[in-house]
């Protein structure tokens, strides 16, 4: 079944990228329905374990202590002048130090960066934000409020609002996608780019069209285009599909010493459990195809790419494809025995590589 669906998805995706307009979106939704079919066995598994209990979920009444603690930095809010959006962040380090801006992925929040907030606050003003629609930040209800251009404008406004003109930009997963794109569009605002388990958009576009296995692994992107169904699937059996990717043996954190405690798992369930809170993060994906077709976009700032070898969502084999899109000093490291959740899985190794990278002297000639 996997092989059959992979081939069908590949045919539909390749065709969609050759057309425009209404037909393009028809094909996207055909792919979404194919993806939904692939998740039917998983949904049935959850239902057969107890049909009534599968549909029992509700908002957590209180955030876990680790999510509100100041152990990793001070919590703050900043409101953007133009958009009016209020962002929640956790910051550590002297405000006179250079800014290191940390961008999380899906379905996460600032807490993903706790190890980096601790590590780099002695030399940087480290700021881990909750992206628009996530965590404690505002979550506009309209689909169009999550278009790429708006998300990039958020980053511009955040950097300036925090009192800086440039930053070390660090992103993981969706935060990595934003970081790649921001570094292309606003290179003068980025001194160093550090990306974890997120492909350059152009490289991913090329890779996925020639690797059906990756297309199948990424089929959730198509599933998330559908209304309501993803929200229901992610909520089933008390948000099992949020917990499981973080914790199980195949998808979750591999390092025994860094396995999430029950309280830490709740740090990633608390916000999605609130009424209507899953839709804004899913709207990132629902706007993704408006970003296609992807054109070749070169990064012109020193770039570090880190990848967990055992990423169950994004194949490590695509890492060599990234270098062609970076016309600046580039370093790529695949971390053995590490999952998609790299900065939480192997924090000591990740932090050392980042620190060594930031110590290097780069002479970059800007065009």
Curated annotation (Swiss-Prot):
UniProt catalytic activity: an epoxide + H2O = an ethanediol; 9,10-epoxyoctadecanoate + H2O = 9,10-dihydroxyoctadecanoate; 9,10-epoxy-(12Z)-octadecenoate + H2O = 9,10-dihydroxy-(12Z)-octadecenoate; 8,9-epoxy-(5Z,11Z,14Z)-eicosatrienoate + H2O = 8,9-dihydroxy-(5Z,11Z,14Z)-eicosatrienoate
Keyword field: Endoplasmic reticulum, Hydrolase, Lipid metabolism, Membrane, Microsome, Transmembrane, Transmembrane helix
GO terms of biological process kind: lipid metabolic process
Known regulation of activity: Inhibited by 1-(1-acetylpiperidin-4-yl)-3-(4-(trifl uoromethoxy)phenyl)urea (TPAU), 1-cyclohexyl-3-dodecylurea (CDU), 12-(3-adamantan-1-yl-ureido)-dodecanoic acid (AUDA), 1-((3S, 5S, 7S)-adamantan-1-yl)-3-(5-(2-(2-ethoxyethoxy) ethoxy)pentyl)urea (AEPU) and to a lesser extent by 8-(3-((3S, 5S, 7S)-adamantan-1-yl)ureido) octanoic acid (AUOA).
Membrane topology: Single-pass membrane protein
Active site location: 173 (nucleophile), 285 (proton donor), 340 (proton acceptor)
Subcellular compartments: Microsome membrane
A cellular component term, taken from the record's GO annotations: membrane
Family affiliation: Belongs to the AB hydrolase superfamily. Epoxide hydrolase family.
Function in brief: Catalyzes the hydrolysis of epoxide-containing fatty acids. Active in vitro against epoxyeicosatrienoic acids (EETs) including 8,9-EET, 9,10-EET, 11,12-EET and 14,15-EET and leukotoxin.
Record protein name field: Epoxide hydrolase 3
């Amino acid at each position: 079944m996997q092989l059959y669906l992979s081939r069908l998805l590949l045919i539909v995706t390749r065709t969609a990228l050759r057309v425009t307009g209404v037909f393009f979106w028809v094909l996207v939704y055909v792919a979404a329905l194919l993806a939904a079919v692939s998740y039917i066995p998983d949904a049935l598994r959850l239902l057969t374990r107890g049909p009534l209990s599968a549909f029992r979920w509700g908002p957590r009444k209180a955030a876990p202590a680790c999510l509100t603690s100041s152990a990793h930095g001070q919590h703050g809010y900043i409101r953007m002048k133009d958009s009016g959006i209020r962002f929640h962040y956790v910051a550590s380090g002297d405000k006179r130090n250079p800014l290191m801006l940390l961008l999380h992925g899906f379905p996460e929040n600032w807490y993903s960066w706790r190890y980096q907030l601790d590590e780099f606050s002695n030399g940087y003003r480290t700021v881990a934000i909750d992206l628009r629609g996530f965590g404690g930040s505002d979550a506009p209800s309209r689909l169009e409020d999550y278009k790429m251009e708006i998300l990039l404008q958020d980053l511009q406004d955040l950097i300036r609002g925090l009192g800086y003109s440039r930053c070390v930009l660090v992103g993981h997963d969706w935060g990595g996608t934003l970081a790649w794109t921001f570094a292309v569009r606003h290179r003068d605002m980025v001194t160093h780019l550090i990306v974890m388990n997120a492909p350059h958009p152009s490289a991913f576009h090329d890779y996925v069209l020639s690797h059906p296995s990756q297309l199948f692994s990424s089929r959730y992107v198509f599933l998330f285009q559908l209304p309501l169904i993803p929200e229901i699937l992610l909520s089933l059996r008390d948000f099992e599909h949020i917990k499981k990717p973080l914790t199980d043996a195949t998808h979750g954190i591999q390092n025994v010493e860094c396995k999430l405690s029950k309280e830490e798992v709740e740090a990633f369930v608390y916000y999605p459990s609130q009424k209507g809170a899953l839709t804004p993060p899913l709207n990132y994906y629902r706007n993704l195809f408006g970003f296609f077709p992807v054109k070749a976009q070169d990064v012109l700032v020193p770039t570090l790419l880190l990848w967990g070898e055992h990423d169950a969502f994004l194949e490590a084999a695509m890492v060599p494809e990234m270098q062609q899109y970076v016309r600046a000093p580039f370093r790529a490291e695949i971390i053995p025995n590490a999952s998609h959740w790299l900065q939480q899985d192997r924090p000591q190794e990740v932090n050392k590589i980042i620190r060594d990278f930031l110590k290097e002297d780069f002479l970059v000639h800007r065009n």
